[in-house]
Regions:
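Cys/His-rich short segments
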Residues: 1-16
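DNA strand-break repair and replication-stress modules
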Residues: 8, 50-236
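Compact, charge-rich alpha-helical regulatory domains located at protein termini
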Residues: 17, 21, 26, 30-68, ...
Length: 237
């Protein structure tokens, strides 16, 4: 469960400022976060930030009061809540990836989003075990389709998704890909530390230009983009 939460807030998923892996682990161990929906109820559960003089009110107060914790303050808590509120609208590819469906990486999530257009359409087909459209997507085979269907057959997963949809809005997919760019249809691999943008931003930019982003170099790789401290991928290329 804790790894699922870390995946949910990872860079290519919800990517919430101030809610990295260490904080997620701490909040999980203290029972503050148990599933992704808890992230979006944090502010409501936090309660007021002012001092309480009534001893009995303190005893009965079940609010989290994150600002009273070591290493936290009113400003840092406000920043966290602001970052969470900013992610109450999320792009469809990020949401699909954030669910942590087996074998569905960020690139595959984008392909699914592009083909289905809306999360409701995708979820309805998977709940009905209708994989015809899914299997028509280049790169998705029977094994992956089975894993996707199995995810939505698990009632706990469906319950979590439905609770999330009460808290957030998943935007329908808008294809802004430039299919006339020189990178359209090309396979690109990134390696090393990029100077002007994060790896996730670079991948998103390449995909918007019609490129396919791969995780490793192969015979199908057209371009390898090297940053600082490029590793084995650059040597292999």
């Amino acid at each position: 469960a804790i790894e699922r939460l870390k995946h949910f807030v990872s860079r290519e998923a919800f990517d919430i400022d101030g809610l990295g892996g260490k904080i997620v682990e701490q909040f999980y161990n203290e029972g503050i976060l148990r599933d992704p929906t808890d992230i979006f109820t944090l502010e409501e559960r936090n309660g007021g930030s002012g001092p309480t003089e009534d001893l009995f009110a303190v005893i009965d107060d079940k609010a989290l009061h994150l600002e009273r914790r070591d290493g936290w303050g009113k400003k840092s808590v406000e920043n966290l809540f602001r970052a969470i509120r900013a992610k109450r609208r999320i792009e469809l590819p990020r949401f699909i990836y954030a669910l942590g469906i087996r074998q569905v990486g960020a690139a595959t999530a984008r392909l699914i989003a592009r083909n289905y257009g809306s999360f409701r359409k995708f979820m309805t087909d998977m709940r009905n075990q209708d994989t015809e459209r899914l299997l028509s997507i280049d790169g998705i085979g029977e094994a992956m389709a089975k894993d996707v269907v199995e995810f939505f057959k698990e009632e706990h997963n469906v319950s979590t998704v439905n609770r999330l949809l009460e808290e957030i809005t998943v935007e329908d997919f808008v294809d802004n890909t430039n299919y006339n760019s020189p990178l359209s249809g090309k396979t690109v691999v990134f390696t090393g530390t990029l100077e002007r943008m994060t790896r996730a931003e670079a991948k998103a930019k390449a995909q918007s230009l019609g490129a396919k982003v791969a995780g490793s170099v192969s015979a199908h790789t057209d371009y390898v983009i090297e940053g600082a401290d490029a590793g084995s991928k650059a040597k292999k290329a």
